[in-house]
C-alpha cells in the first residue's frame, strides 16, 4: 500500500490547472470605482444596516446585470447588496461578536483616501445584485492576476441620482457613447459606463464597449443560466459564484492530463454560495457532472449520503472517509489513463513484489480498507490515521511479508536513507525514521490499522472514541474546534512575525466567539456536493 500511495503521490494525478484568483479581486485592484462599491458593501455588512434606462429591460435586476457578460462566460459572481436584508443583518451581527466592526470599517474607509466621501452616495445606489464576471476562459486561466483585463462588472442601481454624483465635480469625464450608454473615464484613468440605471465597469475600454454591445444583443449570460449553474447551493446567499469548470479545464493547457480522467471529463459546472445565518457562516459547493456513462465506481469518493464518524479529539482537524479503497482505486484508474506507460512500469514493479513475497497487494492491502478511515491533523504538523480492516489478522500477516521491501519503498518516497524497526515481541508498531528526525509508526492495534508521525498519537489512536457530526452528508467529513484552530494559527503567525493586533491598531480578535467547523462532501454520478460551516457560540 505504501508503494502504491508513494507512486500516486509522486505522479500528482489530477492537475486541473490554475484557475486564477478571484475575478472580483482582480477587478477591485484595477478599478477605483469598483473598489468604492466593494468597500461600500463591506462597511454596510459590518454595520448590519443601510441607508428606466437602456439596461433595464431584463426580467430582473440580476438578469440585467448578467446580460453584460457573454453567454459563454466561464465565471460570474453575484453579490447581494440589499443592506436591509437578512444576509447583511446576520453579517453585521457576526462582526459585533468579534468586537472589530468599528476598526475594520475605519480601515476600509482609510483605504479609499479622498474617495471616502463618496461612500454615502454609493450606499444609496445599492440594493440589487452586483455582478462581476470573466469574459474569456483562456485569459482567466492563463493571465497573471494583474494582467487579466477580461472581466466586466455591472449593477442596476436603485438611486440614479446617487449614481450621477459619482461623475459630478470633475470626478469623471465623459468619453463618448456606446449603444446609448454614456462612457466615462475616472480620475484613475479607468473607463466605466452608465447605461440608464446600470453602472458597468470593465478591465479595459475595449472590454467595456464589448460588454455594452453584448447587452444590446441577445447573446448575453442570463439569470436562467446563472440559476441553473448554482441550483445546488443556497439561493438566498450573500454571494453566489457560477463556474463553467468544463470550459475552464478545456481552456487550460495544464488540464489536458486531468481531462483524460473519466470523472473529470464529465464535470460541467459548479456553484458556490456564501451564506450568513444567525449563529453560523456557511459555504455551499455543488459540482455538476454529466452522469451519462458514469458509474459509482468512477467517482473520486464513495457514493451515497451515509457519513462516517470522526475521531473525538480536540485541538486539531478531524477527518473521516468512508471506504478509502474507493479513493485509491480512483487514483490508480486516473493514473493509468493519464500516463499509461509509467503506470505499466508501476504495475510491473508491483507484480515483481507480489511474486517475490507471495502477496496480492490489491486483495491483501487495498481491499482490506473497506470500512472507515479516521484522521486527526494538528497545526503543529502531527497527525494520525486509523483505518478499519476487513480481516485484521490477515492484514498483520501481509505486513510481516512486506518487511523486506518497506525500507526500500520508504526510501523511494522520501529520497533519503531511512531506519526501519520491526515490532518486538508483544509490541504492535513498525517504525520508519529519517536522518532529519521525521518518523512514521504503523501497525495493527486492537483490530485497526494505525499510522502516525507521533508515538503518543499512535499509542492512543486505536482506543480513541468517535462521534457523529451533526448535519454531515457523504463519504468525506471534517470537524474541528474553530476557536482552538484560530487561536493556534494566530499564535503561529505571531511567531513568524505577523501580529494581527498590529493590523487592527492593537485590538485582539475574539476567537472565543467561534464554535465548530463542520464540513462534508457527498458524491453521486450527478455531481459532488458539499458544505463548510463555522458556528459561533454567542447567539
Segments and roles (model prediction):
Residues 11-47:
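Sec-dependent bacterial lipoprotein signal peptides
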Residues 157-160, 204-207, 389-392, 454-455:
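Helix N-cap motif at beta-to-alpha junctions
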Amino acid at each position: 500500500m505504501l508503494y502504491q500511495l508513494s507512486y500516486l503521490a509522486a505522479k500528482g494525478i489530477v492537475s486541473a490547472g490554475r484557475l486564477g484568483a478571484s475575478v472580483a479581486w482582480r477587478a477591485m485592484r484595477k478599478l477605483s470605482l469598483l473598489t468604492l462599491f466593494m468597500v461600500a458593501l463591506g462597511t454596510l455588512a459590518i454595520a448590519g444596516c443601510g441607508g428606466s434606462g437602456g439596461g433595464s429591460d431584463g426580467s430582473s435586476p440580476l438578469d440585467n446585470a448578467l446580460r453584460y457578460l457573454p453567454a459563454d462566460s466561464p465565471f460570474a459572481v453575484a453579490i447581494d447588496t440589499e443592506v436591509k436584508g437578512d444576509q447583511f443583518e446576520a453579517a453585521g451581527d457576526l462582526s459585533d461578536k468579534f468586537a472589530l466592526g468599528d476598526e475594520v470599517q475605519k480601515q476600509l474607509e482609510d483605504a479609499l483616501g479622498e474617495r471616502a466621501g463618496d461612500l454615502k452616495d454609493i450606499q444609496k445606489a445599492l440594493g440589487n445584485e452586483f455582478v462581476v464576471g470573466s469574459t474569456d476562459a483562456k485569459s482567466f486561466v492563463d493571465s497573471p492576476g494583474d494582467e487579466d483585463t477580461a472581466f466586466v462588472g455591472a449593477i442596476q442601481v436603485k438611486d440614479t441620482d446617487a449614481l450621477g454624483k459619482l461623475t459630478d465635480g470633475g470626478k469623471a469625464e465623459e468619453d463618448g457613447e456606446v449603444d446609448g450608454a454614456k462612457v466615462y473615464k475616472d480620475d484613475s484613468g479607468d473607463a466605466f459606463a452608465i447605461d440608464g440605471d446600470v453602472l458597468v465597469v470593465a478591465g479595459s475600454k475595449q472590454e467595456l464597449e464589448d460588454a455594452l454591445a453584448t447587452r444590446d444583443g441577445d447573446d448575453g449570460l442570463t439569470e436562467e443560466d446563472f440559476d441553473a449553474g448554482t441550483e445546488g447551493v443556497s439561493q438566498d446567499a450573500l454571494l453566489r459564484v457560477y463556474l463553467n469548470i468544463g470550459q475552464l479545464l478545456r481552456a487550460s493547457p495544464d488540464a489536458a492530463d486531468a481531462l483524460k480522467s473519466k470523472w473529470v471529463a464529465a464535470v460541467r459546472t459548479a456553484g458556490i454560495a456564501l451564506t450568513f445565518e444567525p449563529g453560523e457562516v456557511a459555504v455551499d459547493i455543488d459540482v455538476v457532472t454529466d452522469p451519462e456513462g458514469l458509474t459509482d465506481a468512477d467517482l473520486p469518493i464513495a457514493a451515497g449520503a451515509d457519513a462516517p464518524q470522526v475521531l473525538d479529539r480536540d485541538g486539531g482537524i478531524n477527518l473521516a472517509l468512508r471506504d478509502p479503497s474507493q479513493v485509491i482505486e480512483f487514483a490508480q484508474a486516473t493514473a493509468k489513463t493519464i500516463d499509461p506507460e509509467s503506470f505499466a512500469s508501476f504495475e510491473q514493479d508491483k507484480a515483481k513484489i507480489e511474486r517475490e513475497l507471495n502477496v496480492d497487494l490489491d486483495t491483501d492491502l487495498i481491499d482490506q480498507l473497506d470500512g472507515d478511515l479516521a484522521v486527526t491533523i494538528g497545526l503543529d504538523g502531527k497527525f494520525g490515521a486509523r483505518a478499519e480492516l476487513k480481516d485484521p489478522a490477515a492484514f498483520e500477516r501481509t505486513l510481516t511479508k512486506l518487511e523486506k521491501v518497506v525500507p526500500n519503498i520508504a526510501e523511494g518516497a522520501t529520497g533519503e536513507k531511512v531506519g526501519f524497526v520491526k515490532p518486538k515481541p508483544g509490541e504492535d508498531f513498525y517504525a520508519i525514521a529519517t536522518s532529519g528526525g521525521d518518523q512514521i509508526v504503523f501497525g495493527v492495534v486492537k483490530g485497526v490499522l494505525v499510522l502516525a508521525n507521533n508515538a503518543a498519537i499512535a499509542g492512543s489512536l486505536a482506543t480513541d472514541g468517535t462521534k457523529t457530526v451533526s448535519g454531515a452528508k457523504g463519504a468525506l467529513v471534517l470537524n474541528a474546534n474553530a476557536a482552538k484552530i484560530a487561536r493556534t494559527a494566530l499564535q503561529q503567525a505571531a511567531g513568524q512575525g505577523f501580529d494581527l493586533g498590529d493590523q487592527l491598531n492593537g485590538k485582539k480578535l475574539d476567537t472565543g466567539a467561534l464554535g465548530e467547523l463542520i464540513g462534508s462532501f457527498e458524491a453521486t454520478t450527478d455531481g459532488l456536493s458539499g458544505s463548510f460551516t463555522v458556528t459561533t457560540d454567542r447567539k
